[in-house]
């Protein structure tokens, strides 16, 4: 599965949100991986969509890259959004877990749980680093 084609599809699916928020989504040259294209599209769509949803007053900037780590590819999805405190980083992958009220940020609280399930189904791992007020970086692996 060509990762760049997948990201373009995810961006097309999010084209209204990207246009309305004036988000900038960029990516480096990305690998071809053995993965279900529909699930990989959903994974990127959820991560990019969250970056747009949880942006600061300025427009969202999202950058996607990948590095070969020998037996796996590590994908990095980095944004300049509102970020979150470190105490919440593990909880966000739990289904229906929300850090904000629906009034502040719409959503169901299942997107990142779906991301985790997709990555695990492909034999990978997903984790996050974040700094409140600076942004969030999601990492996930897909075996080579």
Feature-to-residue mapping (PLM):
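Glycine-rich G1-box
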Residues: 16, 82-83
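Short helix-loop "hinge" at the ATP-lid/N-box region of the Bergerat-fold HATPase_c
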Residues: 51-52
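Short beta-strand/loop element within the Bergerat-fold HATPase_c
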Residues: 59-71
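Short conserved segment of the HATPase_c
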Residues: 84-96, 138
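Short alpha-helical Gxxx[C/S/T] motif in the catalytic ATP-binding
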Residues: 111, 115
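Glycine-rich ATP-binding loops of the HATPase_c
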Residues: 123-129
